[in-house]
Each structure stands twice: as C-alpha cells, then as structure tokens.
C-alpha cells in the first residue's frame, strides 16, 4: 500500500470523485464532453495531486501539492454550480455535496499546514 492511500483526505476525495461522476452523468449528451469533461478533470485532479504530493521528498513540495489539490476542489465545486445554473443538476444535488467539499478543503488545509510546520 502507498502512503497516500492511508490518508483520510485521500479516501474521502475518492468517495467524492464517485459522487461527482454520478452527477455529471445526468448532463445532456453534448455537455458530457464539455462541462462534464472539465468537472471530471478537476475532481480527479484532487486525488491525483494528493497522491503525487505524497511522493515528493520535500515538505515544501508536499504543501504545494495540497494547494493544487485544494484549487482543483474549488474549481470542481464552481463547475457543479455552473451545471446547476444551466439546469443540468438541481441545487439540492449540489448542496448535498457541499459538506464533503468543505470537509475535504479543511483536511487539505490542515495537511498543508502540517507540512509547512516542518519547513
């Protein structure tokens, strides 16, 4: 097992990836490759950057990848709101995921801080 697989933030982000994928499947066919593709890229970037950062040698680099993961998380949430504004998903579907986004954002911030304290 790789070290990142033991991180709670990584495990929670994996669950969120699955939930977001389910939502984007509701998009109209023509949007599954445009907005849907962008949402898929941004949400999978969260787990990818957590994993990549864990493989870095320096705590500075590890903290930086937490920032990138956080930015991708915010991007994905914004895109879900756009999809809601366009009528592809409901406000309830977006708001039901908000607690997961908030929890993961706090966990990423805490992980980043823990690496920065070691600098």
Where are the model-predicted features located?
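Short, C-terminally biased terminal segments at protein or domain edges
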Residues: 1-119
